Amino acid sequence: MEKLTFLILVATVLLTIHVLVQSVGDKHLKRRPKQYATKHLSALMRGHRQCTQQGYGCDETEECCSNLSCKCSGSPLCTSSYCRP
């Protein structure tokens, strides 16, 4: 009987931890679309302008011409990004 009580207690703790970890992950995923929507709205409000060509500095992927992304290269502590394929 004591073993059964102990197993139920352990199962409850593990289930609680699983639910807490899953809910934290869900909040992180829900936040991402808002970030992308904000960037997209910002780009729309700036209006039509020329895109940044490959190899030139950028702050956001929206600045780069089509088929290019704003990427940081070099060391993990990279401070400048460039439009790259």
Swiss-Prot record:
Segments passing through the bilayer: none
Q: Does the keyword GTP-binding apply?
A: no
Q: Which Pfam families match?
A: Conotoxin
**Which top-level group of life is the source organism from?**
Eukaryota
Give the main localization category: secreted
Cite the record's tissue specificity text: Expressed by the venom duct.
Quote the record's domain comment: The cysteine framework is XV (C-C-CC-C-C-C-C).
Claim: Disulfide bond is one of the keywords in the record: yes
- Residues modified as Pyrrolidone carboxylic acid are Q50
GO MF, any single term:
ion channel inhibitor activity
Give the signal sequence positions.
Answer: 1-23
Q: What is stated as this protein's family in its record?
A: Belongs to the conotoxin O2 superfamily.
InterPro entries in alphabetical order: Conotoxin
* Posttranslational modification: Contains 4 disulfide bonds.
Q: Which UniProt keywords apply?
A: Disulfide bond, Pyrrolidone carboxylic acid, Secreted, Signal, Toxin
Q: Which residues form the propeptide?
A: 24-49
Phylogenetic classification of the source organism: Eukaryota, Metazoa, Spiralia, Lophotrochozoa, Mollusca
Q: What is this protein called?
A: Conotoxin Cap15a
Cellular localisation:
Secreted
> One GO CC term of this entry?
extracellular region
